[in-house]
Structures are given as C-alpha cells and as structure tokens.
C-alpha cells in the first residue's frame, strides 16, 4: 500500500476470509450518489465508505448501529492479529491515510473528515494552560 501512495490513483487493499488478496484501483469513473465535494471524493476512505461498504454491504458508516459490523485498526504496519485471525472477518480493507493537502482541501470546503481518517502522529496538544502572574 505504501508503494501505491505515490500514485495519483486511489488504491484499496482487500484480504478475504479465504486468504485471497486484491488491490482495487479507483479510476474516478463512478457516479457518486452523495453530495460530497471533489476534495472529499478524493479520500481513499470515502471511496471505501460510499462506493463499497454502503452499496455492496449495506453499511452506512454514519449510522452508529452499522459500525458494530466494523473493526478499525490504526497504524502503518499490517494488522497482523487480524490477518492471523482472518476467519473472524469476511474482509479486511487496507486504506491509505489522507495527506495534509487532502485534509486542508476538505477543510476549505467546510466538510468534516470521515471518522478515524485523521488519526495521525504527532498529535497536537490542546487544552488550557495558565501561569501565575507576579509572585
């Protein structure tokens, strides 16, 4: 998947319960049924959500009930525990994370990023810090 990141094409990895592996390439020819901006349509995770999970599996990732059918694994390394226990799953999808340019492009449209799509390091610390003034 890391090698596919360098291309302008959206690529998704798929591993099936039977152990077959596939590389899906999105050519940008699908008509989107949602009103997502072009910036959002360019996200690998939205291709997975709107063009695979929703129409083929009936899973709406915006519906909390449907999320019970999904397991999210973060990180750049292959999820070895899932691969070892592939019989517990029907499919494993590998999706590239968005780069900063994609995040900024979506932010400029006023849309929000899909769940879990901005899980990256280093995290920016947030909160309120106060310091005493004077003695």
Regions found by a protein language model. Name each.
Residues 1-135:
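Surface-exposed, charge/polar-rich loops and edge strands
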């Amino acid at each position: 998947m890391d090698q596919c990141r360098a291309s302008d094409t959206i690529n998704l990895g798929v591993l099936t319960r039977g152990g077959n592996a596939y590389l899906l390439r999105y050519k940008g020819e699908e008509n989107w049924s949602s009103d997502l901006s072009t910036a959002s349509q360019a996200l690998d995770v939205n291709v997975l959500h709107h063009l695979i999970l929703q129409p083929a599996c009936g899973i709406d990732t915006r519906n909390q009930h449907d999320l019970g059918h999904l397991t999210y694994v973060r990180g750049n390394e292959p999820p070895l525990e899932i691969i070892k226990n592939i019989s517990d799953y029907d499919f494993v999808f590998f999706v590239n994370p968005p780069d900063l340019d994609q995040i900024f492009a979506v932010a400029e449209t006023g849309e929000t990023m899909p769940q879990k799509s901005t899980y990256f390091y280093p995290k920016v610390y947030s909160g309120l810090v106060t310091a005493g003034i004077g003695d």
